């Protein structure tokens, strides 16, 4: 009954991944991001991650697998997803939703830390403000974006962009793969 739809969805997902893999710059950016994160951890820094909607879940997933575990047991790494409901509701109410991430970065970010901003469109105003706040703190910035990178294009030290112009879910599927690879590479770097 739905076999053609199922095959079509899986084929589109595979094609999106294949196109992403064909650009060596993506592979290089993932490696550089992992080394940047591990270097921050080794120097006493941390990563703050943020996103909206499904990307918010990805930001939480990233932090959870760094502080908890990925595939193997190892020490936890310093990662915070900006996801505290009381913070988000307070800042949204008192300042506006566009400040929910930047206020947190202003409060706990420091030089040597890293901000990971995740936005499938690259146009999330609250992440753009978080990037500005991170820059003011002397933090490094990594972004996971999609399409043409949107307004966030060129704003990060390292941008990992999925150039898919369809629905956001295809971009998110690549983002979660990138997140898992980042964690795997961070673990290898931390063993050095």
From Swiss-Prot:
One Pfam family this sequence matches: SIS_2
Predominant place of localization: cytoplasm
Keywords for the protein's UniProt record, in alphabetical order: Carbohydrate metabolism, Cytoplasm, Isomerase, Metal-binding, Zinc
Pathway stated in the Swiss-Prot or TrEMBL entry: Carbohydrate biosynthesis; D-glycero-D-manno-heptose 7-phosphate biosynthesis; D-glycero-alpha-D-manno-heptose 7-phosphate and D-glycero-beta-D-manno-heptose 7-phosphate from sedoheptulose 7-phosphate: step 1/1
Entry superkingdom: Bacteria
Cofactor note: Binds 1 zinc ion per subunit.
EC number: 5.3.1.28
Alphabetized PROSITE patterns for the sequence: SIS (PS51464)
Catalytic activity: 2 D-sedoheptulose 7-phosphate = D-glycero-alpha-D-manno-heptose 7-phosphate + D-glycero-beta-D-manno-heptose 7-phosphate
One of the protein's GO biological processes: carbohydrate metabolic process
Residues given in the record as substrate binding sites: 52-54, 65, 93-94, 119-121, 124, 172
Gene3D superfamilies: Glucose-6-phosphate isomerase like protein, domain 1
Catalytic class of the enzyme: isomerase
Cellular component terms per the entry's GO annotation: cytoplasm
Annotated HAMAP family: GmhA (MF_00067)
General remark: The reaction produces a racemic mixture of D-glycero-alpha-D-manno-heptose 7-phosphate and D-glycero-beta-D-manno-heptose 7-phosphate.
Quaternary state and interactors: Homotetramer.
Annotated function: Catalyzes the isomerization of sedoheptulose 7-phosphate in D-glycero-D-manno-heptose 7-phosphate.
Record PANTHER family: PHOSPHOHEPTOSE ISOMERASE, SEDOHEPTULOSE 7-PHOSPHATE ISOMERASE / DNAA INITIATOR-ASSOCIATING FACTOR FOR REPLICATION INITIATION
The name this protein goes by in its record: Phosphoheptose isomerase
UniProt source species: Proteus mirabilis (strain HI4320)
Name of encoding gene: gmhA
